[in-house]
Amino acid sequence: MAVGISPGELRELTEEELTERLRESKEELFNLRFQMATGQLNNNRRLRTVRQEIARVYTVLRERELGLAAGPGEPDGKES
């Protein structure tokens, strides 16, 4: 999984790819929290990075839902 993916890169992904990225990030966050609880987490910063990535994915999905941004293959950001 890429560390610190940019919103521009996320906007280039399809909705299915975004959903998959969201699922993977949530799974990673769960594993990181489990490691933290058991005292095995070496990189605390990764928790924040994964949470930010999840928020970015949700933001891109919401932009598309509201018609503020176009996904790949769509002519523009507005729905008709």
Swiss-Prot record:
The lineage of its organism: Bacteria, Bacillati, Actinomycetota, Actinomycetes, Mycobacteriales. This is Large ribosomal subunit protein uL29. HAMAP family: Ribosomal_uL29. GO terms for cellular component: cytosolic large ribosomal subunit. PANTHER family: 60S RIBOSOMAL PROTEIN L35/50S RIBOSOMAL PROTEIN L29 (PTHR10916), LARGE RIBOSOMAL SUBUNIT PROTEIN UL29C (PTHR10916:SF0). GO terms for biological process: translation. Belongs to the universal ribosomal protein uL29 family. Signal peptide: none annotated. It comes from the Bacteria. Keywords: Ribonucleoprotein, Ribosomal protein. One of its GO terms (molecular function) is structural constituent of ribosome.
